[in-house]
Amino acid sequence: MIGKLVRDLKIPDQRHPEKAHRPDNDQPRKPSWIRVKAPTSEGYKETRDIIRGQKLATVCEEAGCPNVGECWGQGHATMMIMGEICTRGCTFCNVATGKPQALDAFEPGRVAHAVSQLGLKHVVVTSVDRDDLEDGGAEHFAQTIRAIRHRAQGTTVEVLVPDFLKCGPEALETVVAARPDVFNHNLETVPGLYPEVRPGARYFHSLRLLQRAKELDPQIFTKSGIMVGLGEDRQGVMQVMDDMRAAGVDFLTIGQYLQPTPKHHRVDRFVTPEEFASYEKAAYGKGFLMVSATPLTRSSYHAGEDFARLRAARLERLGA
């Protein structure tokens, strides 16, 4: 009930009390290449009903993803585990901040059941930050991966994890040992914007997390993403690409930042589709196996199709 109330609140000060002191930022009108249609399809409704029936949260809803109509219409959803309330207060994010509830021991099984009901070939599992937990929720991630493997055999699993900043190294080791097919952790923005955009995180810690995941399991695909339009410049984006490649990241996503409410970080500008195409070309030139760079790209957007292409790209490179 608490989660539903939080999700349904429309007043930014109530959903994001940590941002109440911030001055309002204007929300510029979105250009034509950003606008999407309201979700109305039967597929969308069926996906929604399965998610509701299993009492699950999705980042699609909690973060206000613009692609929810398209993805849910195709029966795809990104499961968000460990509750709907985050212990961090990143200025770009629309997920509610506050004191989370205790973990639900039955959630991994319900996620697996929903994956089976939806008939997913590839599933993305993410979470809120849980700095209140000793392991940051690592074991809960591992249990969810194992439950999906048991209930939906043949489904590939992608995890989008928090940074485990306040945990020991065993947290990351626990997740990687559960053998997800893709290990994703987003850097989100250039390091110079971290104090404003991602104040509870550390750029080089996140970078090392990605590098260490690859060291623990060289066969795992690693993935990371950033938003643009936050105030970064092209040189900064290029440096992040270089840092990711040095950490062994295989798959890069770049998407346009969209401001959830006036209390959130302002949109500095809308990056044009041509600029995104230029970023994609540059990223492939730096050696990424897979790149998705469009205004509406999000971490799990077209994740299933992209995983198939990612796997094919690795095989092609190994055969070259």
Swiss-Prot record:
Catalysed transformations (reactions): [[Fe-S] cluster scaffold protein carrying a second [4Fe-4S](2+) cluster] + N(6)-octanoyl-L-lysyl-[protein] + 2 oxidized [2Fe-2S]-[ferredoxin] + 2 S-adenosyl-L-methionine + 4 H(+) = [[Fe-S] cluster scaffold protein] + N(6)-[(R)-dihydrolipoyl]-L-lysyl-[protein] + 4 Fe(3+) + 2 hydrogen sulfide + 2 5'-deoxyadenosine + 2 L-methionine + 2 reduced [2Fe-2S]-[ferredoxin]
Positions annotated to bind [4Fe-4S] cluster 2: 86, 90, 93
Enzyme type, top EC level: transferase
Subcellular location: Cytoplasm
Cofactors, names only: [4Fe-4S] cluster
Enzyme Commission no: 2.8.1.8
Pfam families listed in its UniProt record: LIAS_N, Radical_SAM
Main location: cytoplasm
Keyword Transferase included in the entry's annotation: yes
Protein's recorded name: Lipoyl synthase
UniProt cross-references to NCBIfam families, sorted A to Z: lipA, PRK05481.1, PRK12928.1
Record text on cofactor binding: Binds 2 [4Fe-4S] clusters per subunit. One cluster is coordinated with 3 cysteines and an exchangeable S-adenosyl-L-methionine.
Residues that coordinate or bind [4Fe-4S] cluster 1: 60, 65, 71, 300
Radical SAM core domain: residues covered: 71-289
Keywords of this entry: 4Fe-4S, Cytoplasm, Iron, Iron-sulfur, Metal-binding, S-adenosyl-L-methionine, Transferase
Record's GO cellular component terms: cytoplasm
InterPro entries: Aldolase_TIM, Elp3/MiaA/NifB-like_rSAM, LIAS_N, Lipoyl_synth, rSAM
Composition bias type Basic and acidic residues, residue spans: 1-29
UniProt keyword annotation of Nucleotidyltransferase present: no
Alphabetical list of SMART domains matching this protein: Elp3 (SM00729)
Molecular-function GO terms, alphabetical: 4 iron, 4 sulfur cluster binding; lipoate synthase activity; metal ion binding
Name of the gene encoding the protein in the UniProt record: lipA
Start and end residues of each stretch annotated as Disordered: 1-32
